[in-house]
Amino acid sequence: DCIKKFREYILENELATVDALDKIEAEAKAHVKKEKEAAWSDFSGEIKKELNEAVALIKSAAQDSTRKVVLDQLADELKKTINPIRKDVVSTVRKALLLLRFDSNSGKNELKAWYEKQTELNHDRYSSHLYSQSEWSVLKIDEVPAEFNEKSAVVDGREVLQAFFDNKLENDPRFFAFGEDVGKIGDVNQAFAGLQAKHGEWRVSDTSIRECTIIGQGIGAALRGLRPIAEIQYLDYLLYGLQMLSDDLASLQYRTKGGQKAPLIVRTRGHRLEGVWHAGSPMGMILSTLRGMVVCVPRDMTQAAGMYNTLLKSDEPAIVVECLNGYRLKERLPENIGEFTVPLGKPEILREGKDLTIVTYGSMCRIVMDAAQELSEIGIEVEVIDVQTLLPFDVHGIIGESVKKTNRVIFADEDVPGGASAFMLQQVIEGQKVFRYLDSDPQTLPAKAHRPAYSSDGDYFSKPSIEDVVEKVYSIMNEVNPKTYPAL
């Protein structure tokens, strides 16, 4: 007990008398007790006021109800509650509204209006600010299209990112990046190649192999107003920093009701390539544990750069999962590399179609687009949609409108069955209420449940292939019109 030891130290060194210390302790206890009682009075007084309002409204609604006896009992029991909490009040009101379901009177309407107002207040008390509600929310950042002209260079995808990072390091003194192999060699895929030599070790730096400390450094820097990019070398390694991301970063804005911000950007790479430890796509894990963070899943490096621009204008933490197999693919370099933005929460329709909608993201976009071309050659036109971000997810209902048009939908990705594909299905079928527009069962096309096997063969047999997409779509169309699309 440090207080006891401190008292002993004071007495041993004759810094005060026993009587003086006893007086200080007594005064301190009295002060704490008084403040505790005042705090409890303030807290409980508001709840008791709500309780009295609820009791009066239930009694009023009961006057003209066939369930008057039961409603009066509910109100009386609530009135007798010792040290009530809000759950007691709201739970009783909800029971009363159920009893009043067959009634129609002003008392019931007043009780219902009171409950709806309390629902809004309690959402603000207990559920608000999971994401930013400020003017710098990612949903409020204006879209600035990428600009190209006939002279726009065609470069490797990693060079698009290199140009973007160079621009930010040049123009924003708050911006810096760090992670395993980010500094001297310019990251494992060379998006930072040469940038440490140009901008210095303080701006582009290496770290030890310790994901949790990378995340911790990033959170601290972001809290102090800097704009760090903390790199986790591969998406599979995110597990080592997941606890800190979930407990300390994703929940920060919620825990403080927007009072604290740590707009850390976690950069990583994943999805298909080769290898059990380097080609994972555990997006369902991320969706379940990192609510409160933005989750970007760009299909190429140009989209990734635009998302970084958007995030750097916002006050929200995010994770950006770049496509591991896309760094050497050719892309056009935007003329406004440091300014263009990609709107988050807004899917993009990559190909229009009338027969079926395929919803996907990341590396699967190229697979699905190739499959769509093959399907077109046999008379099946699919609409391909890139969700672009999983959190936030399609805030404008673009996917739902597509499904209303095609009446069929497949959700495809590289996560395990029941992972992110199931999340997307729930968001669209339930969240956007399109079930009644479906003419065929909604389906998912995920990867296998195991880790991706090694080699190109392992990739082919572990992850959805072009043939898998074609056959999945064809099987649905066979069900629709077996004469035109006979069974394979």
Predicted regions and their residues:
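Thiamine diphosphate
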Residues: 1-321, 324-488
